[in-house]
Amino acid sequence: MKKRLVNILAAAAALAVIIIAVLLCGCAQKDGYEKCAEDFFNALQAKDYDAIYDMMTPSSQSSISREKLKEYYDKVYSALEVTGIEASEFERVNQDRDAVFNYSLKLTSQSCGELSFDSSVTVRALLGFYLVEWTPGNVVPGMDYYDTVQVRTLRGIRGEIFDSSGAVLVKNAYAVTVYFNLNKTADFAASAQALAGILELDADALAQSMTKAAAGGNDTVVAAVYVPGALEAEKEERALAVDGVRVDRSSITPIRQAVYGSAAAHLIGYSTPVTKEDRSNEKYAGLSEGTRVGRIGAEYIYDDILRGTDGVEIVLRSADGSRRTVLYRKEATAGQDVVLTIDIGLQLEAESLMQEKYSQNKSTGAVIVNDPKSGRIKAMASYPTFDLNLYAAPAAAKGAADLIKNEALPLLNRATQGLYPPGSVYKTVSAIAGLETGTVRVDTAFPYEDEIVKVTDKTDGWRPKGSQWSHMIIREHMKSSASYGKLDMKRALVFSDNIYFGWMGMKVGAKDMIAWSERLGIGEQIPFELSVKKSQISNDPENAKLYKNDKFLADTAVGHGELLITPLQLSAIFSLYGNSGSIMQPYCVESICTTDELGRHTAVSVTKEQAYKEQVCSNATVEKISACLEKVTVDGTAKAANVKGMTLVAKTGTAQKNDTEEIGWMAGYIREGGEHYSLLVCVDGPKNGTGAIKTSVAKGLFTYLKDEAQS
């Protein structure tokens, strides 16, 4: 009797569930299958998991509780970052009592985009009512009750950076990672202490990391990361003798390795992993954790090109963790490579010379070598520099923070961001203005030589008659200059005579001096891939002071006054002497390309050469001034930079910053004896301390280029 009563109660309970489900589902005899399926799809799209549970068959409900069902959906859709669900295109595919409906399930995922699956649901008729035979496959097709969903980001490989010859400058690699295998480490504290003594680490912090990792079920703790070649073999051998220590070179720590360390650091730039703060910016909002983004230099300017597009793989894993099936896979797309115009050999030579010479008196500055006929930058160095490999690993090295505090500003690209008075290199601009306006000829002599007076043992001075100037125009006294005869333009250029060019600037007049300076681009921001500071003729955009004050006009004509210019722009202007009077637009990226497994580049785009200022003066003027400048390294201010077997068009300059500091310049163009490149050396250093540096660096580079041409 009791057994019969239990059966009756069980049947009644089942019937009650069915009746409730029917009432909630609204499934009637007429087209009940379709109506029930439709209600299921609507509940799914609304994420109404209570409604789904209420329309499930008793057998489905016996396999999972209401709370577990909600948890199941939430866990899976949370893993997939689902923000929207759409069930559409449903169609009954049989006429059996258990009706099967095929449908398209579309999940909108924040990380994966739109995921589409072909799915199906079974509607069963029970006692004339219609209920859903629910399975985990209705969450994601193919799932079983104990399966888990794993979403794995497929990292889009960042493009690499090469020099003009194809030498790799920045590549994707793996660090030398020193780590502890905790399963093989008997005494955490003792091993941490031993390794810390070898690699100069914090033993206490390391031991704490090991203890914390072990408590969390992890068996690996990274102790130190090194760029390949940085860990000494002797230290590695000693480290491996410590209990539990292992060394990995191929899988643990991916890095962005700068093959030549600090070489071309400001031009190449660096990248670091995207931060939470970055992702608040729309530009980086969709990037996955760990994706590198460029911060400065070419890494920043060409970030969108270098950065690959991440893919995604969604995998079903069984209860034992084994991979059961791939639900979805979108392949990653590698970034494209960037080929720079620089020659790494020349770049290394420039930086070696700067390190040797500039460090002697803590000078700073820049060196640029370019091709006057194309605008290609063949070398660009800023001193002091920094090691790009400080940013190679996912976490920046300790020394990276010190760069920001360093008073020498090693992160500053002085070639493009340093604004300096051009000094006497500007006399080559004034000479163009004088000749092109017809104010003087090369042989036009200064008419007031008898008014020049001796000021000191090393300087002479001149003040126009009737002038109210409180100071004279001062020049350095060079006894050897007298051998050139009268004080004309040739003598004035060779020996950098301030008196001649101050006088000539006044004769040309403010209007034409300004016009010719502007014609050469001064007062503009010269176009370049990297950001460049805008040059100026004076602090006043209208340059009114040049009209009102002859002394200021004369000072400007010799390269002082309030003139400011970047080394990049001054090098471009001087390059007109190697290009028949045209200034080419400088550029540092040769091409964007893809690279195959054999290292062969296929260009996607190539930078086209273009003039920045076409034919700013006649070729006749260029030849006249060049003939004068050829004597600068023979008899004049740059004799120390002369290289036997080379014909050089050159000009030096010095500009006083204050009573204790000056800017030293040397610009030169190789006319014969080497590749027809133009170079510029800028030295920001102590007073009377830049002359030997600028000429020795220039001579070293000229010699290198001569040897390269002959090899």
Positions of predicted regions on the chain:
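Short solvent-exposed beta->alpha transition segments
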Residues: 28-38, 50-100
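Short, low-complexity N-terminal intrinsically disordered segments enriched in polar/charged residues
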Residues: 18-42, 46
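Conserved, well-ordered alpha-helix/loop/beta-strand core segments that scaffold catalytic motifs
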Residues: 323-365
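Short, glycine-anchored, charge-dense loop/turn motifs used at functional sites
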Residues: 161-171, 350, 367-378
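Beta-lactam-recognizing serine transpeptidase/beta-lactamase-like catalytic domain environment
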Residues: 317-327, 342, 365, 370-424, ...
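Second-shell loop/turn segments in exported
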Residues: 38-41, 55-60, 107-110, 148-152, ...
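N-terminal Sec-pathway targeting helices
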Residues: 2-13, 26
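Small/polar-residue-rich segments within soluble enzyme cores
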Residues: 102-125, 129-143, 149-155, 167-201, ...
